């Protein structure tokens, strides 16, 4: 998976299509990402202690990695990521559309 925590992504499919957000967490075994403020789900939580009341919690659900694309905030464009190897042997990520090196 080429996305990392802290990357800005744009949703390209689903109910939140076109929205952007920051990756909070990646789940590489499942090929999914959790994006801040997107794909919200409502969960009803029962009280766990005496005197506590139940509540309704909204939280981010995961999105499949194929439904999001890296978003360049500098160029305002979504693009695929390619991995390149520098002459010193270090690996970098680069945007296919703009050629911008991410890290």
Swiss-Prot record:
Any Pfam family: KOW
SUPFAM superfamilies membership: Translation proteins SH3-like domain (SSF50104)
InterPro entries, sorted: KOW, Rib_uL2_dom2, Ribosomal_uL24, Ribosomal_uL24_CS, Ribosomal_uL24_KOW, Translation_prot_SH3-like_sf
CDD domains for the chain: KOW_RPL26
One annotated Gene Ontology cellular component of this protein: ribosome
GO molecular function, one term: structural constituent of ribosome
GO biological process assignments: translation
Key words of the record: Ribonucleoprotein, Ribosomal protein, RNA-binding, rRNA-binding
Record PROSITE patterns: RIBOSOMAL_L24
The family this protein is said to belong to: Belongs to the universal ribosomal protein uL24 family.
NCBIfam families: rplX_bact (TIGR01079)
Role, per record: One of two assembly initiator proteins, it binds directly to the 5'-end of the 23S rRNA, where it nucleates assembly of the 50S subunit. One of the proteins that surrounds the polypeptide exit tunnel on the outside of the subunit.
Complex and partners: Part of the 50S ribosomal subunit.
Protein name: Large ribosomal subunit protein uL24
Lineage, broadest ranks: Bacteria, Bacillati, Cyanobacteriota, Cyanophyceae, Synechococcales
Gene: rplX
